[in-house]
UniProtKB/Swiss-Prot annotation:
<comment type="similarity">
    <text>Belongs to the NrdI family.</text>
</comment>
<comment type="function">
    <text>Probably involved in ribonucleotide reductase function.</text>
</comment>
<dbReference type="InterPro" id="IPR029039">
    <property type="entry name" value="Flavoprotein-like_sf"/>
</dbReference>
<dbReference type="InterPro" id="IPR004465">
    <property type="entry name" value="RNR_NrdI"/>
</dbReference>
<dbReference type="Pfam" id="PF07972">
    <property type="entry name" value="Flavodoxin_NdrI"/>
</dbReference>
<dbReference type="InterPro" id="IPR020852">
    <property type="entry name" value="RNR_Ib_NrdI_bac"/>
</dbReference>
<dbReference type="GO" id="GO:0036211">
    <property type="term" value="P:protein modification process"/>
</dbReference>
<protein>
    <recommendedName>
        <fullName>Protein NrdI</fullName>
    </recommendedName>
</protein>
<dbReference type="GO" id="GO:0010181">
    <property type="term" value="F:FMN binding"/>
</dbReference>
């Protein structure tokens, strides 16, 4: 069965997209300062991309939301990630859905899909279908002993 873990800010864009998928999903809490939120089954992560870069005042910001960083800094949670899907805004040019690139590289998992803001009906259909294919593919690999667990390496900066 497909398991999704997602983060959505107060804008609720990612939340609305996940709801439209109609699949079992667990939301990473917005306020989980101690990083105690935990999952216990393999999952695909869906997250929005934040601005990233440096603010006018010189404050460093992250493409990956802080609650997601805390969630993935837990070795148990990190060991269960199987892939990532990212939301973003095309107004940010090359940074569009960049959080997905970061998670994919740092956790050594595939970046399955990117969509804008709340996604379109086509995005919802493609993600739903793609997730089914992805989980079936993983099951086949596991049955044939070809599956490998993602990296458990922990980063200090970003997930």
């Amino acid at each position: 069965m497909t398991s999704l873990v997602y983060f959505s800010s107060v804008s609720e864009n990612t939340h609305r997209f996940v709801q439209r998928l109609g699949l079992p999903a667990t939301r990473i809490p917005i306020h989980d300062r101690d990083g105690s939120f935990r999952v216990d089954e393999p999952y695909v992560l869906i997250l929005p991309t934040y601005g990233g870069g440096v603010t006018v005042t010189g404050r460093d910001t992250s493409y990956v939301p802080k609650p997601v960083i805390r969630f993935l800094n837990n070795p148990h949670n990190r060991s269960l990630i199987r892939a990532v899907i990212a939301a973003g805004n095309t107004n940010f040019g090359e940074s569009f859905c960049y959080a997905g690139n970061i998670i994919s590289q740092k956790c050594h998992v595939p970046f399955l899909y990117r969509f804008e803001l709340m996604g379109t009906a086509e995005d919802v259909d493609r993600v739903r279908e793609g997730l089914g294919e992805f989980w079936n593919h993983l099951e086949t690999e596991k049955e044939h002993g070809q599956w490998r667990q993602p990296s458990l390496t922990r980063s200090r900066q970003e997930a």
